[in-house]
């Protein structure tokens, strides 16, 4: 389950792909166009888009860490939260869960001192431990692809830290004072494999540098009853009016300053009262804009799924190969925050999703579909791949064989010509084909292809030399 990147896909992407909404551009008080200060309005939407990742990460942090102890998907600051099993179809804690990797996540601050992450010998098992800054950029990725599977220890240092680390510890410098670890460990989901992964998870440790090599007991943590623990993160962010949003953004930028590359963009925002290191000045923001700025800005963000060149639309699949490191592409960074919070670098994982078949029609469990891979054309990865079935709200679908994902773990059967067919339908395709069956609901559904450690060269989804096949409706 991903408690990070798909916190708010619950609203559905199809309805969010429209152009700027009429309600936002006109509103209850008349049309927006033609009023004085329109230039400032669009500048404010730029600022909203720019800050969307930082505000969303903060709201996510508040929810995940608002717990007295590690339990389920929550745990205090500075403690690793390890999920111990895959969810079933009744799970409703977060959207778009997965059944390929078990997560180990943590939030901590590096403003006062570095934190040390210890990873045991993973015994050849695939894993990765991306480290994200407050702006959702992945600044380091220890893991199988980059550092191997042996025991390893890292110190995550803050932007202003300088000092000497103990021998054998590699430094990763975070650009911000807030750090988000999102560890993933491959697991087949069998009782034996669960036990093996649990033994590894129990050895993941993070401690302040001053306690490295010593016994460490995390400080007590209390629950803040004012934090909304039920409303999805994205919805909470989107509910803020512009003043509340910019006040929070200004406060966050004091501890997580923009990068040097952002300076020209950020300098523009002073005109509307947003200056790094200072409190937000709401007097510089037209009161008529306060409610409309978030509406229009979010529509601009979601429009990127259609118009941003980083977002690919191929054979009914939609995916982005410019994730994890965004530079100054603030719109792409914002849309990934909205629909894929915590996304990996493309070299580590790509997550194409599909709501429509090869003919452009919405998937419907009343029909039968086949995803056909020609011989030697299965997803080219060094890690693993899978296809997951979701209902329209991005939850698993109950089915008689309790299968929510299909991958080579099912010992897929090949056709006589060496090709492979995945059968996507509500009823069994027959016992001889059940190994290749991904059960669908009776109604609408969504598919997601996960590709971990995808090839970077031919054949590769990253450079376009490998193409995802369409999902075709069959008689």
Description of each model-found segment:
Residues 17-23:
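Hydrophobic h-region of N-terminal signal peptides that target proteins for export
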Residues 1-15:
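N-terminal secretory signal peptides and thylakoid transit peptides that target proteins
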Residues 28-475:
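A compositional/structural signature for long, glycine/proline-rich flexible linkers
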């Amino acid at each position: 389950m991903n408690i990070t990147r798909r916190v708010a896909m619950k609203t559905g992407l199809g309805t969010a792909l429209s152009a700027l909404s009429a309600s936002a551009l006109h509103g209850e008080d008349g049309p927006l166009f033609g009023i004085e200060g329109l230039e400032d309005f669009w500048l404010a939407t730029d600022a909203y888009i720019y800050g969307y990742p930082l505000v969303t990460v903060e709201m996510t942090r508040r929810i995940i860490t608002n717990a007295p102890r590690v339990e389920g998907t929550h745990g205090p600051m500075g403690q690793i939260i390890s999920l111990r099993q895959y969810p079933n179809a009744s799970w409703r804690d977060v959207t778009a869960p997965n059944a390929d990797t078990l997560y180990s996540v943590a939030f901590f601050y590096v403003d006062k001192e570095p934190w040390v992450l210890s990873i045991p010998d993973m015994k050849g098992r695939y894993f990765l431990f991306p480290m994200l800054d407050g702006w959702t950029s992945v600044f380091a990725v220890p893991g199988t692809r980059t550092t191997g599977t042996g025991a390893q220890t890292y110190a995550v240092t803050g932007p202003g830290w300088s000092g000497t680390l103990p021998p054998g510890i590699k430094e990763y410098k975070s650009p911000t004072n807030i750090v988000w670890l999102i560890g993933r460990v491959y697991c087949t989901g069998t009782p034996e494999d669960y036990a093996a992964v649990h033994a590894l998870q129990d050895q993941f440790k993070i401690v302040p540098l001053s306690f490295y090599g010593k016994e460490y007991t995390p400080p007590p943590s209390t629950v803040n009853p004012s934090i909304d623990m039920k409303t999805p993160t994205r919805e909470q962010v989107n509910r803020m009016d512009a003043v509340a949003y910019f006040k929070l953004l200004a406060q966050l930028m004091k501890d997580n300053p923009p990068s040097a590359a952002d300076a020209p963009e950020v300098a523009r925002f002073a005109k509307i009262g947003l200056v790094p290191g200072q409190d937000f000045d709401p007097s510089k923001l037209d009161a008529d804009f306060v409610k409309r700025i978030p509406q229009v800005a979010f529509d601009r963000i979601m429009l990127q799924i259609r118009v941003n060149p980083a977002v690919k639309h191929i054979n009914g699949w939609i995916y982005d190969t410019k994730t994890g490191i965004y530079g100054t592409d603030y719109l792409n960074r914002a849309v990934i925050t909205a629909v894929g919070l915590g996304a990996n670098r493309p070299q580590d994982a790509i997550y194409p999703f599909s709501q429509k078949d090869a003919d452009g029609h919405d998937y419907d469990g009343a029909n039968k579909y086949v995803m056909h891979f020609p011989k030697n054309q299965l997803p080219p990865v060094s890690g693993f791949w899978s296809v997951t079935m979701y209902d329209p709200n991005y939850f698993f679908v109950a089915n008689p064989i309790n299968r929510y994902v299909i991958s080579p773990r099912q010992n897929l059967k090949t056709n006589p010509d060496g090709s492979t067919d995945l059968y996507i339908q509500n009823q069994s395709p027959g016992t001889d084909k059940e190994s290749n069956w991904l059960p669908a609901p009776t109604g609408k559904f969504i598919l997601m292809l996960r590709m971990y450690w995808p090839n970077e060269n031919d054949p590769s989804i990253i450079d376009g030399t490998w193409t995802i096949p369409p999902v075709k409706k069959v008689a």
